Amino acid sequence: MTSNTGMLPLTPGLGPLAPSIYASNTNNKVLIIDNGGHTLKIATNNPSQPHIIVPNQVGKVKNEKHQIMGEELINYNDPSEVRSRNPMEKGYITNWGLEKEIWDYAFKRDDMKIKPQDYNLLLTEAPNSLDDLRKTMYEVVYEQYKFKSLYLTTSSTLGLVHIKQQLLQYQQQQHQPPLDASMISLLKSPCHLVVDCGYSSTHIIPHFQNTRLNYAIKRFNIGGKLLTNYLKEIVSFRYWDMMHETKLMNTIKEKTCFISKDFIFDIKRSQIDKLNSNLKIDYVLPNYNDPNNKTGYIKENLNNNNNNNDKNDKLNVNIEKDKDNNDIKSKEEGEEIKLNDEIKKDSTTTTNTTKEEDMEQVLSLVNERFTVPELLFNPSDIGMNQAGLAESIVQSINCTNSNLHIPLYSNIILLGGSTLFPGLKERLELELRKLAPEQYNINIFQPQDPILSPLYGGIRLAQQPDYLKYSISKQDYEEYGYNYCNKKFF
């Protein structure tokens, strides 16, 4: 059957804070916090107040006693001198003392100025959190901050709310092209499968009528943090010690990495002609003394570009011949790529300097660009005994009632920063097509901003006239305790 990988429509005038969605619940102040492992995304239901993004980290500068956070942490002159602490482990808040420091900073910012006791709180957490962690969270929210009420949910549910509301509003606008059949299905279907690939881990979360099917949620421990750390290890092994350059390596990962559509083919291509491969990218490392080069940049190499067009055709011919001779075997036939062995055998990371740019440090990346994010599909490449993205989706769907399988395959939504790798949607569709029943349609969708969609969904939800009936008031918590909260939310 047919398959589709689509980007949701972006309508002129249909921003996340479009005035038409602020119609009902503006009298009750609501604070929305999408509490991610990498950043906090914070907004209120006041349409005139912008949202903010705050690093969910506290930094300490070498040889200094004071801590830094927020903008000071982002803009610190030499990030390699900063040691950061994160209040979360594997996606769950385990250090509420540290998390509270970050919240306090965010609430006191000039663009927020939040008094918690005047607000109702809408907060996200990772699915299937532990009761002990939730108990501490309730104590912080109700007893220390004294929020008027709490509504606890997941980023996946809020992202789904935003996407459906966005499609509905698009459909209602005049002079817009009509939605295609797959978009209409996404809007009207009661079944959706959300892939939330974030900083700490990846969750596969099926929904029925906007409600999570907790028994079918699947998780594997590959996220943006692990991918960045893996890239750090590869580069540090091959040339420079980058183990204290987490921020820089995260930036390089985001700017240079992609998902290969044919991993074996690209591995072979990178081995045949390392220096002149079209896969090669030269990244100029930052000079922290230069205000114009704080993050580094991709260097244009005109000589390589001119030579690559002719050489690439020859390489492709040679590789196809190798395929015919069974030198390249498919993964289905049993070939396993041992990335750790490959790292030791093949040092493709080099430095390049010219007389004109003798002060530049240039990091050349070839197969690192796609072997790192390949872990999303094959965690076993680094010895993790976990299913990858496509297999986890199939396992999650198979846990649900068989009547839900067709609509779940037809309405897959990608959320989270780690879904932004170029080629991920296309590769996922190819992998699912191999695993799913032939008669099923596979449709994969991604919002324009998969990182902020949950926050926008929270804003929309907070505007509903019946929002407060889904939350638990401070009075109810004080009367019935945290077990009552768990029963109502979960």
UniProtKB/Swiss-Prot annotation:
Signal peptide: none annotated. It is found in: Cytoplasm, Cytoskeleton. Its main location: cytoplasm. Keywords: Cytoplasm, Cytoskeleton. One of its GO terms (molecular function) is nucleosome binding. It comes from the Eukaryota. Coiled coil: none annotated. It holds the Pfam family Actin. One of its GO terms (cellular component) is cytoskeleton. InterPro entries: Actin (IPR004000), ATPase_NBD (IPR043129). SMART domains: ACTIN (SM00268). Transmembrane segments: none annotated. Belongs to the actin family. ARP6 subfamily. This is Actin-related protein 6. The lineage of its organism: Eukaryota, Amoebozoa, Evosea, Eumycetozoa, Dictyostelia. The gene is arpF.
